A protein has these predicted regions:
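Short beta-strand segments at enzyme active-site cores
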Residues: 58-65, 168
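Active-site-adjacent betaalpha module
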Residues: 1-12, 21, 48-56, 73-74, ...
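Acidic/histidine-rich helix-loop elements
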Residues: 23-39, 83
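Substrate-engagement module of ASCE P-loop NTPases
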Residues: 40-50
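Short hydrophobic beta-strand that contains or immediately precedes a catalytic carboxylate
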Residues: 14-16
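Catalytic-core segment of enzymes that process non-peptidic bonds
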Residues: 62-71, 77
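Short active-site-proximal "capping" loops at secondary-structure junctions
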Residues: 19-21, 28-30, 66-68
Length: 211
């Protein structure tokens, strides 16, 4: 049986927060993610999916968290817990190594980097939806960090906006198995039309390229 196909005219890969602070040894948040990320083979799988998308000329979009800058949040009346954590830890600090995209995942010319999101959803208060629609994208293959926060929030919002979502379940990670279970087994299945492995999506993209 042929694998599920992805029409590259209307499908894009969405890469969420591949920052050094998340997915590189020495990153501020890596130690919290390391156990689950390594068990899930998260980073190599993310790279495999990204390379497959590029090789098959699938459009690639990036949804990136706000890089911390001095003064961020200081005058806000309310700060969500996840924002407070980013503020206190200066996560993804602008101008630092941790705030850079890991080298293997750096966007190439022609790949679209949406405006940075301030909380969790890659869509909220950014131009991601506009960029996708202006490029004729209706279907998303989603991967990145963190499964129970930015990834889940972005998948939910994508469904609300009418996108058909495929979630790559072994190209993401959370702080614990419990949080991974909540994201991938409980919440995301309500919004993603398909939840697949890296091998499945890579095979699908390769199949499409041969047609």
């Amino acid at each position: 049986m042929a694998p599920v196909t992805y029409d590259k005219e209307i499908t894009a890969l969405l890469v969420i927060d591949p920052y050094n602070d998340f997915i590189s040894e020495g990153g501020k948040i890596w130690d919290r993610l390391k156990g689950v990320a390594e068990a899930n083979n998260c980073v190599p799988n993310m790279l495999q999916v990204l390379n497959a998308a590029r090789e098959t000329e699938l459009r690639v979009f990036y949804a990136l968290h706000r890089q911390y800058r001095p003064g961020d949040y200081e005058t806000w009346k309310y700060i969500a817990p996840t924002q407070k954590s980013a503020w206190l830890h200066k996560a993804f600090e602008h101008g630092t190594w941790g705030g850079e995209i890991r080298k293997e995942f750096e966007p190439r010319p022609g790949e679209i980097v949406a405006q940075e999101h301030w909380c969790s959803s890659g869509f909220a208060n950014t131009d991601l939806d506009l960029q996708l629609k202006k490029h004729g994208i209706h279907k998303l293959i989603v991967m990145g960090l963190i499964a129970h926060t930015c990834v889940e929030a972005t998948v939910r919002y994508a469904a609300e906006l009418g996108y058909e979502v495929t979630m790559v379940k072994d190209a993401t990670a959370s702080y614990s198995d419990k949080e991974m279970h909540a994201a991938l087994k409980v919440n995301i299945p309500n919004y993603a039309s398909a939840i697949v492995t890296t091998n499945e999506v890579v095979n699908s993209l390769s199949w499409d390229a041969l047609q």
